[in-house]
A protein has these predicted regions:
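N-terminal substrate-binding region of glycoside hydrolase catalytic domains
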Residues: 1-58, 87
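Active-site mouth loops of central-metabolism enzymes
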Residues: 5-18, 108-122, 291-300
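Hydrophobic targeting/anchoring helices
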Residues: 28, 33, 38-41, 136, ...
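Glycine-rich, aromatic-flanked loop segments that form ligand/cofactor-binding clefts
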Residues: 32-36, 58-106, 137-147, 218-222
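Short acidic catalytic loops
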Residues: 32-39, 130-145, 318-322, 405-413, ...
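Active-site-adjacent "subsite" loops/lids of carbohydrate-active enzymes
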Residues: 73-133, 169-194, 198
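Active-site-proximal loop/short-helix segments
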Residues: 140-189, 226-230
Length: 650
């Protein structure tokens, strides 16, 4: 595995700063495999060419000096290509080309239009200048995306609208184009526009690659990627962007800047697993450890959990922001201590896949025919986030449906699933909400779900668990989220009308005691699948009464008794499981501040020998045996609050 540090330009550009950096790197060089030196002026999208030319010889000297003290690989991270935000416009010359314009007419001060021919020429030039410093590699950062360049949904400048009109044979101005894109019946136009955006991203990546390789074809290129759903406005074509850049490196990132809400880490780890899955064949996969704005926002303890989780999510390297030469003694010491375990974990993970449930994501979700949401929204990201809800009950996850026994589908993500894929998904296990059910019925597949939507209600409902085997001891108990606290205007809960063969898991009651109908159903369909539909706050308030007790049982029932990992002894233990022909790896994190009981972990895999490590990579005793079903059973000591275990099994 590889550990890389990214170094801010302020730490290498001036001699006195570089001397301090040099001393720190000399001290820790045995734990540093790679350095990436930032180039550019802050987050704005224009790196003045004259300044870049002035910096390039200095950059070259720094690279030579760092390699001379034993750093194996030293390269460059372009801070900005298109710009992250408008920043420092009072101090830096304005871009000499068109900046991006939003759908609302708002114009960026410093982020260039990605379709402008002058901009593509500038990108080629600026990357070629950086390449003259002869770095081992050049990273494109995560500003290479359509969205969030100060204006949220670009680009609607005159030039872009003219290009789109020529491409599609239309005559539209900004206002008419925006109105048309918002019309539900204009889904083909939306798809054309999103494809237009996708091509713009490919052109930018290609221009950067051409700039680098015009100087030296041996310089490796890489892209820092972001949450797939953040890029739905350009059809989330991460794989195409990597190919256009001829990338040999990928750096999944996005979010989790501090540990104030530590459970958000697992949303990022799911995102990283998805980004990694859409980077097939890329040999160098480095996790981006975010700590923006580059400060001590996280404890060393959380760093250990986060970085081990990243290796479980599919990365084989770690990229940290410029923590040196700042105060890093405790972190660097902890990383030195845990490194042997990380090395073994990366080796064991080779050839394995994550197993668990899959939150379904379709890159074309914003351009689907039955999608009801605005193309100028973040609904796709919200849907994907909702689909990860079973993670809050500790359920192991996988980014790909083919590696899952159960898939979760939220809202109009259902609209984007292809006609070929629907039977494949619904022949296994599916957990979905009432909104997804309605779209499934509109598409002609309602017979796969076992129910249809009934009467809508806007307030005053709770759900009661029925005496079903899935509910166990929760039978007769009530779950009340006090629904009108959360969205007085927009809340709608619909009853479900079960079809023949469907089993009712919960019933909806008014606060005055009136039974208004089913709130959750379970159904075995005619193609062999198991389907659960939840209509009462399917994805929210997962810690309300009954969820921790019933979700694991429901997921196992949807998997037909084959969910790959079951944990007894703690209701807030998040699992990540990878399996392969030669064994499995398991990562457990207690996401509660209370210790668990002794953990009994059942794994649907064989186990000859298991090695257990604590949060800091120290080996612990581990008892492994086979359970009555012939699967691995691990008996692990009680896990402390916000502690972690890593298991490597052969």
């Amino acid at each position: 595995m590889k550990i890389c540090y990214r170094i801010a330009q302020r730490d290498w550009l001036k001699d006195e700063s570089f001397e301090a950096l040099y001393r720190s790197i000399e001290k820790w060089k045995n734990n540093i495999d790679e350095l990436a030196l930032f180039t550019g002026l802050a987050h704005l999208g224009h790196y003045p060419v004259a300044f870049a030319r002035k910096c390039a010889p200095i950059l070259k000297r720094r690279i030579i000096a760092l390699k001379e003290i034993g750093i194996p690989s030293v390269g460059v991270n372009m801070w900005s290509t298109l710009g992250h935000v408008d920043e420092s416009w009072d101090w830096v010359e304005a871009p000499p080309f068109q900046t991006v314009v939003g759908h609302d007419g708002k114009t960026s001060l410093g982020c260039p239009c990605m379709r402008n021919e002058g901009v593509l020429d500038y990108i080629r030039e600026i990357y070629s200048i950086v390449a003259t410093a002869q770095p081992d590699f050049v990273w494109l950062d995560d500003d290479v995306r359509m969205q969030h360049h100060m204006v949220e949904f670009p680009c609607f400048c005159h030039g872009c609208i003219q290009k789109f009109n020529r491409r599609t044979g239309r005559v539209l101005n900004r206002e008419r184009l925006v109105k048309a894109l918002e019309a539900p019946e204009q889904w083909k136009l939306r798809r054309e526009f999103l494809e237009f955006n996708r091509q713009a991203m490919l052109d930018v990546c290609k221009a950067a690659e051409e700039g680098v390789h015009s100087v030296n074809p041996a310089i490796r290129t890489g892209i820092m990627t972001t949450d797939m759903a953040w890029n739905s406005y350009a059809l989330s074509d991460q794989e195409g962007m990597l190919q256009a850049a001829k990338a040999e490196m990928v750096r999944p990132g996005g979010g989790f800047y501090n540990d104030e809400t530590p459970t958000l880490l697992f949303h990022k780890l799911h995102s990283v697993s998805l980004q990694s899955a859409y980077a097939p064949g890329i040999p160098d996969n480095q996790y981006e450890l975010e700590d923006f704005p580059i400060c001590r926002n996280k404890s060393v303890h959380i760093h250990m959990i986060e970085l081990t989780g990243a290796l479980m999510a599919g990365c084989n390297g770690l990229a940290l922001n410029s923590v040196i030469p700042n105060e890093t003694e405790a972190l660097m010491t902890a990383m030195e201590r845990i490194r042997p375990m990380w090395n073994r974990l990366v080796k064991a993970n080779a050839g394995t896949e994550l197993r668990g449930f899959c939150p379904v994501y379709v890159p074309q979700c914003d351009g689907a025919e039955f999608a009801a949401h605005s193309v100028f929204s973040h609904v796709s990201s919200e849907n994907l986030s909702n689909e990860t809800a079973p993670m809050r009950m500790g359920m192991a996850f996988t980014p790909l449906p083919e590696n899952a026994e159960v898939c979760t589908i939220c809202g109009d993500m259902m609209a984007a699933i292809s006609d070929e894929e629907i039977p494949r998904l619904f022949s296994k296990g599916v957990l979905m909400d009432a909104e997804a059910l309605e779209i499934l019925i509109r598409r002609g597949y309602g017979d796969l779900a076992g129910c249809r939507p009934g009467t809508p209600y806007h307030d005053g409902l709770l759900e009661r668990y029925t005496p079903h085997s899935i509910n166990g001891a929760m039978a007769g108990k009530e779950r009340d989220v006090f629904m009108t606290f959360w969205d007085r205007e927009g809340i709608t809960v619909k009853t479900l009308i079960p079809q023949e063969g469907a089993e009712v898991l919960t019933e909806l009651f008014s606060i005055t005691g009136q039974n208004v109908g089913a709130g959750a159903t379970f159904f075995r369909n005619h193609i062999g699948g198991r389907v659960a539909v939840l209509s009462y706050f399917a994805w929210k308030h997962q810690n309300t009464l009954g969820k921790a007790e019933t979700v694991p049982c429901l997921m196992d029932a949807l998997a037909d008794g084959r969910f790959p990992v079951k944990i007894d002894g703690g209701t807030h233990v998040q699992a990540m499981l990878r399996t392969g022909d030669s064994g499995f790896t398991l990562f457990l994190t207690n996401t509660s501040f209370d210790a668990t009981r002794e953990l009994h972990v059942h794994i649907r895999a064989r186990c000859r020998k298991a090695t257990l490590y604590d949060t800091y990579g120290q080996e612990l005793p581990c008892a492994s045996e086979m359970d009555e079903q012939g699967n691995a059973l691990l008996r692990l000591p009680a896990l402390a609050g916000w502690g972690a275990y890593t298991v490597i099994a052969e």
